[in-house]
């Protein structure tokens, strides 16, 4: 239970009309302690919430306002930024100056240096002028099951991407223990169309993506370097890996399959399962499935839970890790609120769904 005063748990959602913002509003509408007191937007400024999303209840029919830092600071203690890459950086420094604690859902502060971000987000770096390298160094990478202590005291948490979340959760325990080789790591991941956001895009049209599955950004996907950065930090040695995402014709859900070679070929699947269980025993947001049971994305849909499974191929000494999440919940908004819970002193799972509706 939190030591926080309920009066200091006011939350601003900036970018409320995108998929991330909609999920945040939906989840916080049932939260026992946080209260949404400010909605910020650009295109939707001036509209009442019920005009934007009549299908999501709100205790107060707030009007969406321009994201003015002074206005936000007057109405909120925390800010959840669900903005396009680059845009968060234009608002964050001013909010930090006003003692607003931030969870940023974009990639703006996931890298430990501004230079790294500019190397990956080239287009955005030419559009938005940034001089906040110190904030990049100070920001906490928000995988709650791994960085709880830093998140608790952080003023700026960078929420991981959906692909990094699903890929790193099963992989990091083995890198941390030095149980897998650093070379030859392969991640094959598949995600639904909502991962592309709410803005219209040709390749996300029903007639384009229905009844089809396709890889994209086979080389140089932006999440590759994000995964590599965290894998390197955990293992203590530089890591380069192969990451290939695929678009599948479903709305939500993400499946990641990670291939790694075991240093000790004598390890069994049960041995490896014990490794995962040891790391996540105290976390209800991660569930380890029995050996031989492999999760479906539908099992995690609408939840803030990651389902992990594994197998060992004794023929080649390879460890196969399988992870599924809801890309909009555990891969985005739910994880953001999980971080927010920690920052406010609440339990990880407070106000978050952990059981799916099936089918």
From Swiss-Prot:
Top-level taxonomic group: Bacteria
GO CC terms: cytoplasm
Involved pathway(s): Amino-acid biosynthesis; L-arginine biosynthesis; N(2)-acetyl-L-ornithine from L-glutamate: step 3/4
UniProt keywords, alphabetically: Amino-acid biosynthesis, Arginine biosynthesis, Cytoplasm, NADP, Oxidoreductase
CDD domains registered for this protein in UniProt: AGPR_1_C, AGPR_1_N
Localisation per UniProt entry: Cytoplasm
Active site: residue positions: 162
MF terms (GO), sorted A to Z: N-acetyl-gamma-glutamyl-phosphate reductase activity; NAD binding; NADP+ binding
Intrachain S-S bonds: none
Catalysed reaction equations from the record: N-acetyl-L-glutamate 5-semialdehyde + phosphate + NADP(+) = N-acetyl-L-glutamyl 5-phosphate + NADPH + H(+)
GO biological process: L-arginine biosynthetic process
Pfam family, one: Semialdhyde_dhC_1
Enzyme Commission number: 1.2.1.38
Function of the protein: Catalyzes the NADPH-dependent reduction of N-acetyl-5-glutamyl phosphate to yield N-acetyl-L-glutamate 5-semialdehyde.
NCBIfam families xrefs: argC
Family: Belongs to the NAGSA dehydrogenase family. Type 1 subfamily.
Protein name as catalogued: N-acetyl-gamma-glutamyl-phosphate reductase
Organism: Prochlorococcus marinus (strain MIT 9211)
Name of encoding gene: argC
